[in-house]
Regions:
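Bacterial N-terminal signal peptides that target proteins for export
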Residues: 1-11
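Bacterial N-terminal signal peptides
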Residues: 10-20
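Polar-face residues of amphipathic alpha-helices and helix-prone low-complexity segments
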Residues: 22-145
Length: 145
């Protein structure tokens, strides 16, 4: 049952991650964290006049993270039969948290596209915080699995 739920989550993430970007096979959790910290911080530097660039940058960062999450889900799925009950539960919980946090970041991305000038600063900060949370959770999950 848990395997079916994990696969369903992986499929949902795959659909959310179109188009997927290529993934480096050997990336440490620290490298991942640093790269994603830079992406989240970069969004904060855009002015409302640079909205299109900010959205493009945010989408690319989110797409890249989606691809890495999908790869992690595939790796977990490939090892599922070798995991004990505790590790399976942890994997399921990690993927569920990533899915929820990814959805939150996607909502902020939508807000970036449509925010008013007055709300721009709050929306940028909201996306950055949401993205940073997601990236941190991914780095932690990658390190655990």
């Amino acid at each position: 049952m848990n395997r079916k739920i994990l696969r369903a989550g992986a499929v949902a993430l795959a659909f959310a991650a179109m188009p997927l970007l290529s993934i480096a096979n050997e990336t440490s959790a620290k490298d991942v964290g640093k790269k994603f910290d830079e992406a989240g911080t970069a969004i904060k530097d855009y002015s409302v006049e640079q909205r299109d660039e900010a959205v493009k940058s945010a989408k690319a960062a989110l797409d890249d993270l989606d691809a890495k999450i999908n790869r992690l889900a595939a790796d977990i799925d490939a090892q599922w039969d070798k995991l004990d009950a505790s590790a399976r539960k942890k994997a399921y919980e990690s993927m569920d948290r990533l899915r929820r946090e990814r959805n939150d970041a996607a909502e902020w991305l939508g807000a970036l596209k449509h925010s008013s000038k007055e709300a721009w600063g709050d929306v940028k900060n909201g996306f950055s915080k949401s993205y940073d949370t997601l990236a941190s959770s991914f780095a932690k999950a990658k390190e655990e699995f």
